[in-house]
Curated annotation (Swiss-Prot):
Changing T466A: No effect on interaction with FBXO11. The gene is DTL. GO terms for molecular function: protein-macromolecule adaptor activity. This is Denticleless protein homolog. Changing T464A: Blocks interaction with FBXO11 and increases protein stability. Not phosphorylated by CDK1 or CDK2.
Amino acid sequence: MLFNSVLRQPQLGVLRNGWSSQYPLQSLLTGYQCSGNDEHTSYGETGVPVPPFGCTFSSAPNMEHVLAVANEEGFVRLYNTESQSFRKKCFKEWMAHWNAVFDLAWVPGELKLVTAAGDQTAKFWDVKAGELIGTCKGHQCSLKSVAFSKFEKAVFCTGGRDGNIMVWDTRCNKKDGFYRQVNQISGAHNTSDKQTPSKPKKKQNSKGLAPSVDFQQSVTVVLFQDENTLVSAGAVDGIIKVWDLRKNYTAYRQEPIASKSFLYPGSSTRKLGYSSLILDSTGSTLFANCTDDNIYMFNMTGLKTSPVAIFNGHQNSTFYVKSSLSPDDQFLVSGSSDEAAYIWKVSTPWQPPTVLLGHSQEVTSVCWCPSDFTKIATCSDDNTLKIWRLNRGLEEKPGGDKLSTVGWASQKKKESRPGLVTVTSSQSTPAKAPRAKCNPSNSSPSSAACAPSCAGDLPLPSNTPTFSIKTSPAKARSPINRRGSVSSVSPKPPSSFKMSIRNWVTRTPSSSPPITPPASETKIMSPRKALIPVSQKSSQAEACSESRNRVKRRLDSSCLESVKQKCVKSCNCVTELDGQVENLHLDLCCLAGNQEDLSKDSLGPTKSSKIEGAGTSISEPPSPISPYASESCGTLPLPLRPCGEGSEMVGKENSSPENKNWLLAMAAKRKAENPSPRSPSSQTPNSRRQSGKKLPSPVTITPSSMRKICTYFHRKSQEDFCGPEHSTEL
């Protein structure tokens, strides 16, 4: 009692800036505890535990310690919270509704209360006499909130899921045994999504008014600011509206217009609702508990509608989480969906709150005793009611054993922002360094460690980061510079449209060292002709012996790994495939084709498609202009012929001006041998090659030795083509 008298003393003094002189009580918040005697289980009709939905302390004189609790089964219980020593805490209970009671409110200064339930009614009870005074009927859905005016004991308001706000007056005569609303706000929180303007409807009598139903625009909480002002909030529109009750909203059923609105101030993309609204003792500050895990504080007397403070740290995922203020308006307590209750100091909302721990489910309704700072009541979905008291060290049994503690308070620590978290060097992941060597586990091909760094372009490996290195064009295209600057620069990010197979060729153990052309013969090529040898005849003699070994090279993955391990900076690895080697490779393919029957050679394109992977390891992928590059050049083993006149023939892919005469000579020879016209498609690629070089044993090509495409299909007998007369004559 001494503690309460000290707390009440500042309230009698002079206000400072709208606030009374206050004692530093924040250090006492961590002293709240809940003993085993202050934990009560909420039971239903059959004795099964059910969750309590609402709790509130009485405001009647000398009865401020009475706590009313309503649960899901429709029961209302009264608890005596004056002391822990009382054995019988619940001194009265009754079934108020045959449905869940979502909210209840005491009549100011009297032992009477009103309950709002899911049976679409609100009931007026005399607690002292234990009887029902009257039933308020008018809503068409569950009632979610009820509130009394501090200035009128007979006037209260209700809000329901039907989207309507109704004002009731118990002084009016009851009609057919039920109270009727004296004022109604229909569609109080409808969203403005209609494109057409609302049509004015004819005036109706308020007594016979049928309320509208809107299941999507539920009114979750209503509150009286004064005798003429009502505050409400909805479930989805995110707007807090202030209504002037001096206006008769039941006269015309139009879209109601509030006198003031507080728009949703949060950052959520969708508009959210509010689960609780409370006013301080002066009625000038509003605390709105939003479902975006924030509590917004608004100034009701100013013109600004933006919040003056924001409290966070808790979680609010349902419309059952409520809030309450301490008797001196210093502290704000709220339930939370994370099984705890939170207490903030109103003047310092940025400081971490004090947490009341002990519940095992969501904490829904909370109430700070208006006459005792040391007492807080909390309801939870774990079917229990807890009464928290300040621990003064006096709560002991006569035997000396302390009471069992089922709830305690702790100070929440400041949480570091995710963007400000500092990671130490030992925990951080090192950045990927540019890899100059190829990884044998890469799924896509990459250049070897000794491959030229800037000559040609390779496809990027799938797991290799991209790096950009600029080099001079002259150095990138000179064969001498390419071989000399292998280990000096890291690989350039290749582009797929400039890919060349030459840059993938590496040195095998049995290959001969590369022959460096004289400086006089080394030329700087243009970007478009970087892969075309300019002088072929001048380097044929030198490249003839070298090409015998180069033609056997393959780009096998195992070969790349073995060569890559042995490669050093000073190695003489072959980095390109000269044009003479490609010409010799075509000669070998033609020689192998000449040793087989010409009838079997016509199947060459079919066989070459099966070994296309081996063929592409030596020459470039075929272009649509040159069909010879896709021949069966990869058939191994092939006998090597001496470098002679046959090696002078070069392919069309090298674009040499002298290569145009052999095709004309072959066409003239064909016309001389075959006077009858032939289809161009009947000539096989091997026959085209034979006309451009001298063979050891020349083969005369006749129409009988060439197989047409029709010979591969089933040939019908003459009986199928001839009639019966012709068969008998034969």
